[in-house]
């Protein structure tokens, strides 16, 4: 069981005190996975984010956006949605405009028959940027989102202004060989309950993870199964040395999922990459949201200099 917890949890999303190493600067069968959300026709330039739908290549994606300025696109992990980024979208306006996307099958985005893979998610993100007339955004990815963005940066290097990789992995680890054989979508949800708890440091107040546990039963197991299986086979280790975009890596010192050792390994492979380490576990943005907001803001402002 410990092996299963370690492996599937590496596939889960990081939800930021910290040591800086860079210069101061739905139910089963439904169409979504994650939080219940309400669509809105337009985005506010500042303040509370607004939601709207964007049609791309046969699938409709739901996005949250707020603020003005240069675009920053946020990508969530395997068991969350765009809502985890809502407090950050207008935080850096008027210099940066925040856009958070529900990946296909998640949140308010449509769920096609297939395509819930790292590769397809990255293609969808480029199609979304095209539809929004965004050439080179800053990309921020958490856990699975960070895996997607490493693939995106390799496949579309000219579409990346900068990367922020949060609590993620390059796939350089031993994966549970039994993971692809877990066939029942409900099994993924049951395993995920344990993983969520195990991903927080001992002594974490249950209030931080209880909302996630309560939403497990609404997650679409089919989407979760395909995404987790894709994550179990994804591996860009040794190839990300080709990434030339400015990169910030963020990791929790107590993260047993995407460990500090993995983060340091990614830093060594990407020339000039900067690293920030927080005193948190895997769900960093739940444990220290204000710390994460500050670090991301410092990095974004540094890009503008």
Predicted regions and their residues:
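Alpha/beta-hydrolase fold catalytic core
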Residues: 2, 6-72, 95-96, 218, ...
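Conserved HGGG/HGGXW glycine-rich cap/lid loop of the alpha/beta-hydrolase fold
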Residues: 59-108
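Active-site loop/oxyanion-hole signature of alpha/beta-hydrolase fold enzymes
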Residues: 64, 90, 100-140, 144, ...
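Flexible "cap/lid" loop of the alpha/beta hydrolase fold
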Residues: 147-155, 160-190
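Conserved alpha/beta-hydrolase catalytic His-Asp/Glu region
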Residues: 173-174, 179, 186-242
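Short beta-strand/loop motif that positions the catalytic acidic residue
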Residues: 243, 249-251
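Acidic catalytic loop of the alpha/beta-hydrolase fold
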Residues: 254-258
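Catalytic histidine-centered segment of alpha/beta-hydrolase-like enzymes
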Residues: 281-293
